[in-house]
Amino acid sequence: MAYEKELDAAKKAASLAARLCQKVQKALLQSDVQSKSDKSPVTVADYGSQAVVSLVLEKELSSEPFSLVAEEDSGDLRKDGSQDTLERITKLVNDTLATEESFNGSTLSTDDLLRAIDCGTSEGGPNGRHWVLDPIDGTKGFLRGDQYAVALGLLEEGKVVLGVLACPNLPLASIAGNNKNKSSSDEIGCLFFATIGSGTYMQLLDSKSSPVKVQVSSVENPEEASFFESFEGAHSLHDLSSSIANKLGVKAPPVRIDSQAKYGALSRGDGAIYLRFPHKGYREKIWDHVAGAIVVTEAGGIVTDAAGKPLDFSKGKYLDLDTGIIVANEKLMPLLLKAVRDSIAEQEKASAL
């Protein structure tokens, strides 16, 4: 398999970060939640997850130049009054890494932790290799006890070549009730991974179980398709998604879940369509889609903007998008693009009146 060494490191990093997140989610304390300037909640686990991934990748791939594009920086943790939070994160990270032989006996200081978090301040771009991380994708889902993901991808010369999604709360069985992935298991926690040209695989997050190759839904009739969208109305225009679904003839109600767990569920055929149309003025960040995009495309799906253009991850931290992001299989995509085009045109016409 291509990128075998990088994939092993990424799976280890994402799995350990997910273990840290699970520990925090189980005992979520009010003091864990801080407020960032953009009003989205950020947690102790967010910082801890980023530190774990940064430290594991650096150690496992020590012979290579290391560039990480990630969501968090340590600015808030360096402010007065943050010492208790910083020490708590440092302890969590140390406890998590102590389970790994390669880190046994090495204890991080708070300064080590801040440095690890700030390794994620790369800008990305079209040249070289860049790891791309969302340490907790779906922070609001995490805080509610719902879906979230540790999402880690690798860009090489601006192209996505590897992606790992650790989804601690995603059942092994289908979340759409169709049970296409043929699991009757009630086990929870999935790890999805893909490398370019090698397909997408899923396995239980907390076990050495054998990975299973997965495929997107083969549904050709939109009436039989189910579609995913963001749980939070603040993240996506649900009215526009509803209009598109109506034009397609989709009969099933939308499945609304947080985070790139949607991409994982789509890759194994739980749903057939994903619609994401952010509110005007919102700029999509690459860490919200890099890992998920390759997980779906390697499983046979197509990921584009609303005009049908492939997503371009080579422009730095932000995606330069036409309106939104849509995902479907090869058969449904032409029908979906037409429904999207017609619905957007109607919406623009209505707003001009």
Curated annotation (Swiss-Prot):
It catalyses: 3'-phosphoadenylyl sulfate + H2O = adenosine 5'-phosphosulfate + phosphate; adenosine 3',5'-bisphosphate + H2O = AMP + phosphate; adenosine 2',5'-bisphosphate + H2O = AMP + phosphate; 1D-myo-inositol 1,4-bisphosphate + H2O = 1D-myo-inositol 4-phosphate + phosphate. Disulfide bonds: none annotated. Optimum pH is 7.5. Adenosine 3',5'-bisphosphate binds at residues 139, 235, 259, 262, 276, 288. Inhibited non-competitively by Li(+) (IC(50)=0.20 mM) and Na(+) (IC(50)=200 mM). GO terms for biological process: abscisic acid-activated signaling pathway; sulfur compound metabolic process. GO terms for molecular function: 3'(2'),5'-bisphosphate nucleotidase activity; inositol-1,4-bisphosphate 1-phosphatase activity; metal ion binding. Pfam families: Inositol_P. Mg(2+) 2 binds at residues 134, 137, 288. The keyword Metal-binding applies. InterPro entries: DPNP, Inositol_monoP_metal-BS, Inositol_monoP_superfamily, Inositol_monophosphatase-like. Keywords: Abscisic acid signaling pathway, Calcium, Hydrolase, Lithium, Magnesium, Metal-binding, Multifunctional enzyme. Expressed in roots, leaves, stems, flowers and siliques. Its cofactor is Mg(2+). Belongs to the inositol monophosphatase superfamily. Phosphatase that converts adenosine 3'-phosphate 5'-phosphosulfate (PAPS) to adenosine 5'-phosphosulfate (APS) and 3'(2')-phosphoadenosine 5'-phosphate (PAP) to AMP. May regulate the flux of sulfur in the sulfur-activation pathway by converting PAPS to APS. May play a role in the biosynthesis of sulfate conjugates and RNA processing. Is also able to hydrolyze inositol 1,4-bisphosphate and inositol 1,3,4-trisphosphate. Could be considered as a negative regulator of abscisic acid (ABA)- and stress-responsive genes, through modulating the inositol 1,4,5-trisphosphate (IP3) turnover. This is 3'(2'),5'-bisphosphate nucleotidase 1. The gene is SAL1.
